[in-house]
């Protein structure tokens, strides 16, 4: 018989840097999950990813206080900021441009995020990433 799901917890945790401090500790503590067990498992699973990149994670907590979790790819905005070499996007994206990204960089980001995105082809995923870039005040070079 399948375990009864008690809750789903969605967090963004830095790759390889999960620890019991907020936001991880309070979110999992409320559900009665062993926090250190999650931290060790998460850090082990994300050790191949660049340390410090925020990784969205969905934790499924069961009634017996056991858990499973699924890691996603880093947000597109974070990958775009890294590719453009900027700290943050523009406050006025239509007026103030803060950086540039090339089609090759957008293709690379789309391929990285392919598993978590909708869209039939890599080209449609690239258009989505390019739209995110424009909304951040980045110029998309052809």
Curated annotation (Swiss-Prot):
SUPFAM superfamilies (UniProt xref): Ribosomal L11/L12e N-terminal domain, Ribosomal protein L11, C-terminal domain
Listed GO biological process terms: translation
Tagged with keyword rRNA processing: no
Annotated family: Belongs to the universal ribosomal protein uL11 family.
Protein name in the entry: Large ribosomal subunit protein uL11
InterPro entries: Ribosomal_uL11 (IPR000911), Ribosomal_uL11_bac-typ (IPR006519), Ribosomal_uL11_C (IPR020783), Ribosomal_uL11_C_sf (IPR036769), Ribosomal_uL11_N (IPR020784), Ribosomal_uL11_N_sf (IPR036796)
Organism: Actinobacillus succinogenes (strain ATCC 55618 / DSM 22257 / CCUG 43843 / 130Z)
Top-level taxonomic group: Bacteria
Molecular function per GO: large ribosomal subunit rRNA binding; structural constituent of ribosome
């Amino acid at each position: 018989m399948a375990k009864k799901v008690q809750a789903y917890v969605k967090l963004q945790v830095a790759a390889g840097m999960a620890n019991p401090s907020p936001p991880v500790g309070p979110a999992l503590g409320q559900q009665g999950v062993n926090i250190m067990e999650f931290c060790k498992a998460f850090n082990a699973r994300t050790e191949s990813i660049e340390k410090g990149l925020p990784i969205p994670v969905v934790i499924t907590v069961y009634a017996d206080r056991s858990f499973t979790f699924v890691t996603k790819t880093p947000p597109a905005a974070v990958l775009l900021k890294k590719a453009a070499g900027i700290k943050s996007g523009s406050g006025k994206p239509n007026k103030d441009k803060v950086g540039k990204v090339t089609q090759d960089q957008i293709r690379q980001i789309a391929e990285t995020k392919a598993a978590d995105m909708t869209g039939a082809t890599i080209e449609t995923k690239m258009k989505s990433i390019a739209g995110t870039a424009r909304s951040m005040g980045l110029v998309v070079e052809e």
